[in-house]
Amino acid sequence: MIIRRFVRHLSTSKSSIRINAVGIQHLAPSLQNQLFGKSSPRLDEDLINMAKRHLKSNNLIGKKSSLNDPIEIQLPSLQGNTLDEHFYKLGSASLEPYNPLIDELLNLNIIEPQFEFAFQSGWTRYAPGEPSEKVPYPLEDSYFFDVETMYKVSQYPVMAVALSDKAWYGWVSPYLTEESTTNDHLIPLNTFETEKFIVGHNVSYDRARALEEYNLKQTKAFWMDTMALHVSVSGMCTRQRGTWIKHNKKEQENTMSVASIKSKVQNEELQELLDSTSIEDPMLEDNPWINKSSLNSLERVAEFYCKIKLKKDIRNSFATEDPDELRGNFDELMQYCAKDVFATGKVFQKVYPKFKKLIPHPVTLAALKDISSCILPTTTKWEDYIETSERLYQESRRMIEKNLHVICEETVKLKDDPTKPWENDPWLSQLDWTIDPIRLTKKGEIHKNQKLPGYPNWYKQLIVKNELKLTTKTRTSPLLLKLAWNGNPLYWIQTQGWCFKVPKNKTEEYEKLNFVMVSLKKLSEDPGFESIRAEDLKNFTFVKVPHPDGPSARVTNCMTKSCLGFFEKGFLNSQYPLAKDALQMAVASSYWTSSRERIMNQFVVFEDDMGYILPQIIPMGTITRRAVENTWLTASNAKKNRLGSELKSLIEAPKGYCFVGADVDSEELWIASLIGDSVFKIHGGTAIGWMTLEGTKNEGTDLHSKTAKILGISRNEAKIFNYGRIYGAGIKFTTTLLKKFNPALSDAEAKATANALYTATKGISGRYDKKSIWYGGSESIIFNRLEAIAEMAHPKTPVLGAGITAPLQKANLSTNNFLTSRINWAIQSSGVDYLHLLIISMDYLIKLFDIDARLCITVHDEIRYLVKEEDKFRAAYALQISNLWTRAMFCQQLGINEVPQSCAFFSAVDLDFVLRKEVDLDCVTPSNPDPIPCGKSLDIYQLLQQEDIKGADFPRTMHLNDVHYRKRTPVIEMFDKAVDDKTRKFMVSLQIAQDKTEFTKWKRSRGELIVH
């Protein structure tokens, strides 16, 4: 039964303002009761007093905190007694239609096809014991699926294979059977009529070839990606990947050598011995996790889980541009496709149960359905955008190159100057001015087969097919442009990259600034050592041009975005204005040059003036379960000097629709601070928690302002340091980054500043009970908490209880414990929990409020829905409720039955007709000179004043009583139960000690707790 009721009003009563013991405003009583019930949360006075002492030592107690009008709205009823029960039921209800379909595939006895595929267009069904029959689409509702394309010709499919529990299916494009002269055919799957569960490896590629998916209305298909399941269960972190590849290569070499020996051994007993012999591998002893993972391709994953060896050579057939080659090899190619389907099915049956065991909460699985069903609508402007961006890029490139060629041609004329002026020029002397003797025929004529007789070698190397090939990327260009660092000429050294030479008497000056000197030994090992002039070696020191990635990296191109800052600050200079023009062109084009191929290869399906892009999302593409996609999830925001950077704004809502979305404010920073606050069981109990919730730029009490002050950098730059630190990055990272922002800092200054930051934030490292412990910093409590979670035998995210991947579980680690990666996992994976909760809330409220909306795209802490225009305010309202429920779930799971009002709701919900970071971003770029009109942005107060919300009736509940809830103990509660109350408080006292003296005092007073 649905009950309707008047839903909202703003409280004008000051008595409804609730402030906690450290000055954080909580929700109004009515909202508090709806979320957590009427019983008041119990507070521990000892912990409160310790929190106050900790805040006082960080100069935060008594600081100004904000008070806002309490918000009192009638929420839809929770589905159960707790937020965990509520979300469990929401997730389970969303999955309910798909569970029997999943079971069908899990119980399927998968056998490879024992028949030839019919060469006929459309779908053909092959059921055991029955004649093959032509069908409009697969008749069953769950199946494994794989698609193949002639990718050099078109992104449209040419063939596909599916396997259900009843039959095999083959689909053939009418283009391949020559019933159509065009190749623009999509695959019908009938996904609007009934729920479908479709499994593929990197299934977003297959989904993009499904006919029904190109529709504003969302289909009932659940696209399940075995690659995503594998990554979440057995994926490696970035730092492990190189080691795995190195080991795998070595293993293959060893296997080949054993096979070679075996082939030459005639004795049967020796052959058996070789079969049973495993080669001892010291790398495995240090890295036992290697055997717990694989790379992500189907070939690797099938071998890892199922010992299936896929032969992938035949896939090269799809690189052809001649369809006759496919027609002539049709059945073999269909069998290849079927083998991939077979392997995908086997992998799914192995990895899905592991996934359910490791990540059991239904919210995670349910959220994958929407993430895998994203859609990006566009218009014919898409084609104009590509044409304009490419044209401007080519025009700019040609202009710069033309001017560069002029300099080159002027320079080469010096060859005729008898004084050889290049010999005393520090740049031009690096070029090879050798002119090979002109070969003459017997008649005294110049021999025809000579390349540019009479020209120096450096110039001849630039001529390809009688054309000068010289760009800003060419190694010769910085020398022709006479680039210098602080007036010191640049010099190319193969093993060190671009350097500059400074007089010996200035070497110490650069050493103090932590520049990297190139030793004589390293110079002597360089292939070009002999070309360095003796007087240069005697009178100059060679110094490396700084690289953003640190001292060991080498700069190979000075005309890139990473060097722009050096030009702007005057470190890099040239006598030619063209140098800066070229660099600015390189910077302006940097986005387009790095993204153009991906953008041009987007598969856009047009219907009249509307186009649709199905983003190629891997819904769990990293070990933290973040979604991955290489264009839309990494697209930058529009910048006035970046060609093509208005990309996102090309995603435009169709007429009658708009985008409704929001960014989660300081999502991962808040999660980290909440994990710390859970120690005191009060919001804002830690310094970082208080700064995250109440700190302001004006007061200088927010985290970024504090860090900026310590480091002497801008607040914006400070954000990078803060997030890096929270993710587990150390002092080395901070020192390197400081040098990047200010190359003039000496090594000692950078290290001292970084140490000061870490002492003030992470704190001092102490020892207690044979374990290390951080104390004295504003973030010590958080880091101790995060490290403790990361050091668990089976770490779980605090909210949804998602487990860490096998290669990062403690039992599979040895000499390298990958602690930084595991801390990073705890935060980022919790951020993914947040997103999944938000999506499932919206999924429920869209149905409850009867809103015409679907998920458009999500990028980590951003979420955007495509919504019917008349539903936009109700969709915004649903988003605000979803955020409130999600924050409340986080708080409750971390042991605090309160929500701070400052973060309960999105700071704003955006209503817009294009995708962009901010509604007032005009998206003007070199390729888009016309500003895009602004959208709307509404905070919760403004939203509640809209006529569609003000005084409206909203449904209160939906019948979900059939869902059985399995109660669980919160992860943090289990974690805290490991020690008794007195010990826990003692450990808190150690962590909030301000210095070594106080820390030692607390260690000695082990039994007598003082909290005042």
From Swiss-Prot:
Biological processes per GO annotation: mitochondrial DNA replication
Catalytic activity: DNA(n) + a 2'-deoxyribonucleoside 5'-triphosphate = DNA(n+1) + diphosphate
Any one cellular-component term (Gene Ontology): gamma DNA polymerase complex
Reported cofactor(s): Mg(2+)
Cellular localization per UniProt: Mitochondrion
SMART domains in UniProt: POLAc
EC number: 2.7.7.7
First-level EC class: transferase
Family: Belongs to the DNA polymerase type-A family.
Function: Involved in the replication of mitochondrial DNA.
Miscellaneous notes: In eukaryotes there are five DNA polymerases: alpha, beta, gamma, delta, and epsilon which are responsible for different reactions of DNA synthesis.
Protein name: DNA polymerase gamma
Source organism: Komagataella pastoris
